[in-house]
Amino acid sequence: GSYWESVCGYSRAVKKGERILVSGTTAIHGEDRVICRDDPRGQAVYILDKILAAVSALGGQRSDIVRTRVYLANQDHFESVSRVHGRYFEGLNPANTTIEVSNLIGDHLVEIEAEAIVDEG
């Protein structure tokens, strides 16, 4: 897990039954290195790769993701981040909510959560 996961007492992702819940994920590496500091598109790519790795580590795959929530620090980033999301989930089309928030901690421009359901049958 990341530095902040241990400090704050949470998991990147948890699996309960068939559900995988991925915590709000930002483009941070280590304790404080923001990846693609001024690039919302680059942050979205980094975040979605991190989310897919977390889902995979718990036995899921991209096609198991049924919901995403995208938080943007600036609504002007909606199109560029949405296009990245669209490339990652083309043809899968999970439920999605995208909202602008008043602020994200640090220099983050994007934060994304995800939920997956793994058919264990």
What is each stretch, according to the model?
Residues 1-121:
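Short, polar/acidic, helix-capping and beta-turn segments at strand->helix junctions
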